Amino acid sequence: QEATVKPGVEQVLAAMHARGVRMCVASGTETPLIEAALTSHGLMRWFEFAVDCKNPDGKKKPDVYLDALHRFGVQNPVQATVFEDSPVGIATARAAGFATVGIYDEPMAEFWPQITQTADFASRTWQDWLQNVQQTGPAPRK
């Protein structure tokens, strides 16, 4: 299946990069596939690395998020934010201590009400999230 780039993603990545935010991709998809998709769309340049779930439970366990955090040399999840489109990923990341941003994705539409209730901040579009942060700063944690 061909990966598509959501509108506003590159603008958000560029803005975060300009602010010195270090970024990676932590995914349930295997790393070579992640890197190939990001490279084909010119997005890998914004990320320091990609990491996939090694745990058979996937994102039901925080291993992929903690692995990414530790690769940055950071130990405390409070110092990082996880962007997710799945309620399982959001719940797991929050339980591990990460700030969370829920981003709407059409294949996960049925879970949107749950995502908006669970994430620290939820946005239907990447542009809306960026505009909110630029106007008000990061959203407080729930």
Give the role of each language-model region.
Residues 20, 25-26, 40, 106:
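Short secondary-structure boundary micro-motifs
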Residues 1-25, 31, 35:
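Short, acidic loop-to-helix structural element flanking the phosphoryl-transfer center
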Residues 14, 31, 35-142:
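Asp-based, Mg2+/Mn2+-dependent phosphohydrolase catalytic module
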